[in-house]
Amino acid sequence: MIKDMQPFLQQAWEKAGFKELTEIQKQAIPTILEGQDVIAESPTGTGKTLAYLLPLLHKINPEVKQPQVVVLAPTRELVMQIHEEVQKFTAGTEISGASLIGGADIKRQVEKLKKHPRVIVGSPGRILELIRMKKLKMHEVKTIVFDEFDQIVKQKMMGAVQDVIKSTMRDRQLVFFSATMTKAAEDAARDLAVEPQLVRVTRAESKSLVEHTYIICERREKNDYVRRIMHMGDVKAVAFLNDPFRLDEITEKLKFRKMKAAALHAEASKQEREATMRAFRGGKLEILLATDIAARGIDIDDLTHVIHLELPDTVDQYIHRSGRTGRMGKEGTVVSLVTPQEERKLLQFAKKLGIVFTKQEMFKGSFVETKPKAPKKKKPAFTGKKKPR
C-alpha cells in the first residue's frame, strides 16, 4: 500500500523507520483514498494519525495553493503533534501545513495563511474565527478530519464543528477518529456524515506489545514501588493520579528520593507545559506525574512505562492512560499499583478489555510473577480411634 503512494511519502515512511502498516492503517487508508466518509475507532498508540494523514497527503494537489485538508483536534498538544507529523511527512515538498490554536497571536496565524498551507491543523474555535474573518478560505477543502472526536463532543465544541463543515463544499469528505468512540460521539458523527464506513480495531487486533501488570501493596507503599520501578534501569514513565491536589505532594516525595520527577498541571501555562515536556523528552526528567486532564494530548514516542498510582474510575480512562506506551508496535509496560481492595476493580477492567493482567512482585530490582500459594493440606480429623499397629 505504501509503495503505491507518492514518492515523498515512501521516503518519509522509510526515514521514520516503519516496517509495516498497523491494523487501523490497513483498514482505514483504502477507504479514505476512495473519498468515503469514515468513522474509525482504534486504541491509543496504534498509528491513527498516519492512518488518515498518509492517504490525505497522497491526494493533495500542490498546484492548488489553498487549504485542501483541515484537521480539527480538541487540545493544543494534539494539534501540535499532528502538525509535527505533517511537517515530517511533507519535508522537502511544496506541501506545507499550518497550526492554528486558540490563545495564540491571531495576527501571526493570519501571516501563516498567506504562505498558502495545504494542510490546516487547529482547534475548532480558532479555525471558525479565522473563517468568519475571511482569512481562511475553505472552498478548496476536500476533507475535514476530526481527531479524538469523542473529546470534541464531550467538550461541547459541536456548534463550531457544524459551522466549519457548512463553510466547505457539499461534496467534501468527513473523517472521524477516536481511541474510544462513545455512543454519543458515534451518533453525532453519523448525523454529520454521508453513508459513513465504520472501521473498528480492537486492542487484540492491534497486536499490542504492551504488558499489563499489577502489584498489590498498601497505599502508603505506592511511592516506594514507583522508586523501585524507576531504578530498574532505562525507564521513562508517566504516573497517573486521580486527585490533582496530590500531584505536587507526590512529586516532592519522589524528588526527595533522588528521582528526576516533575508534575504536569492542567492549569499550567502553555510555556510551562512546553518546558516540562522538553525536559522530559530531552532526558532531564525520568518521570512525569499527571492527571487524565493534565496529560490530554501528550504523545511521547519512547515512553517505556505507564504507572497507575491511583486506579482510574473507568475502562476508557485506563485505555487512554495505558495507550501512551507501546506506540506504533513498540514494547511497553503498564503497571497498576493497587491495594487489596482495588484488585477486584482492576480485574473487572481486565475482563471488559479482554486483557491478561499479570500479578507481579518486585524481587532484586525486577518484576517476578506472583505464584499462587499452594493450598494447605488439611490435617485428618481426629476420630478418637487409635491406628492399628
UniProtKB/Swiss-Prot annotation:
A motif (Q motif) lies at residues 1-26. SMART domains: DEXDc, HELICc. Keywords: ATP-binding, Helicase, Hydrolase, Nucleotide-binding, Stress response. One of its GO terms (biological process) is response to cold. PROSITE patterns: HELICASE_ATP_BIND_1, HELICASE_CTER, Q_MOTIF. Disruption phenotype: Longer lag phase at 20 degrees Celsius, wild-type growth rate at 30 degrees Celsius, no growth at 10 degrees Celsius. At 12 degrees Celsius cells were short and stocky, by transmission electron microscopy the cytoplasm appears empty although cells are viable. Decreased growth in the presence of H(2)O(2) and diamide. It holds the Pfam family Helicase_C. Residues 368-389 are annotated as: Disordered. The keyword Repeat does not apply. A motif (DEAD box) lies at residues 147-150. One of its GO terms (molecular function) is RNA strand annealing activity. It catalyses: ATP + H2O = ADP + phosphate + H(+). ATP binds at residues 42-49. Its EC number is 3.6.4.13. Residues 29-199 form the Helicase ATP-binding domain. Residues 209-379 form the Helicase C-terminal domain. Induction: Induced at 10 degrees Celsius. GO terms for cellular component: cytosol. Residues 373-389 have a biased composition (Basic residues). It is an enzyme of class 3 (hydrolase). The keyword ATP-binding applies. InterPro entries: DEAD/DEAH_box_helicase_dom (IPR011545), DEAD_box_RNA_helicases (IPR050547), Helicase_ATP-bd (IPR014001), Helicase_C-like (IPR001650), P-loop_NTPase (IPR027417). DEAD-box RNA helicase. Probably has an RNA-dependent ATPase activity and a 3' to 5' RNA helicase activity that uses the energy of ATP hydrolysis to destabilize and unwind short RNA duplexes. This is DEAD-box ATP-dependent RNA helicase CshC. It comes from Bacillus cereus (strain ATCC 14579 / DSM 31 / CCUG 7414 / JCM 2152 / NBRC 15305 / NCIMB 9373 / NCTC 2599 / NRRL B-3711).
